[in-house]
């Protein structure tokens, strides 16, 4: 549906350079259209129409139009992923252009494996490059305290939101590089 709509709409097709997808296991999807031109109200109207067509076919969709120094968000600039891990559901906000594990099913297995390895652990955990808290949140249940470091501002923001959303209180997020951690 998306491809057909883009091919048949000259406003959406004109200087379209790239299409990016961010999807959840539940089917929620964020589509980013990247252009080599300035986006105007005509583009926004065409994208709104596309969003309406997509919404009639599946779970929630959002569209982002990007061009040099320009970002137009129709809907949200994130998806909400829910991962069932060891008899608990964890909710993760995943932002556009921020790293997230691309395969939700494999991600669940990786997290469960890490939690199994940590099941007998005691004490505290130091996690480097925690991203949006993908491993941090589930692993925090196996430790007294967690210090999680990350460089990316958007990932730190997502991790903070994810900790709050999941009611996890034993994690401290710090914006540091691994090099800064080793110097501390």
Predicted regions and their residues:
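Residue-level marker of positions within ordered structural domains that often coincide
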Residues: 7, 24, 119
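Rossmann-like S-adenosyl-L-methionine
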Residues: 38-184
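Short edge beta-strands and adjacent turn/loop segments
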Residues: 13-26
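Extended interfacial segments that mediate partner engagement and assembly in macromolecular machines
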Residues: 1-16
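Structural motif
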Residues: 29-30, 124
């Amino acid at each position: 549906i998306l491809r057909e709509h883009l091919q048949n709409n000259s406003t959406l097709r004109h200087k379209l350079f790239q299409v990016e997808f961010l999807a959840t296991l539940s089917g929620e999807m964020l589509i980013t259209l990247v252009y080599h031109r300035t986006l105007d109200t005509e583009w926004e109207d065409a994208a709104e129409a596309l969003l309406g067509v997509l919404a009639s076919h599946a779970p929630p969709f959002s569209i982002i139009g990007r061009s040099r120094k320009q970002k137009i968000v129709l809907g949200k600039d994130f998806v909400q992923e829910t991962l069932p891990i060891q008899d608990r559901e964890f909710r993760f906000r995943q932002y556009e252009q921020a790293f997230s594990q691309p395969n939700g099913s494999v991600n669940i297995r990786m997290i469960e494996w890490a939690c199994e390895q940590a099941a007998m652990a005691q004490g505290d955990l130091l996690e480097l490059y925690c991203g949006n808290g993908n491993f941090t949140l589930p692993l925090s249940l196996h430790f007294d305290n967690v210090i999680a470091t990350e460089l990316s501002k958007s990932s730190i923001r997502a991790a903070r939101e994810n900790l709050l959303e999941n009611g996890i209180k034993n994690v401290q997020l710090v914006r540091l590089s691994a090099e800064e951690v080793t110097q501390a």
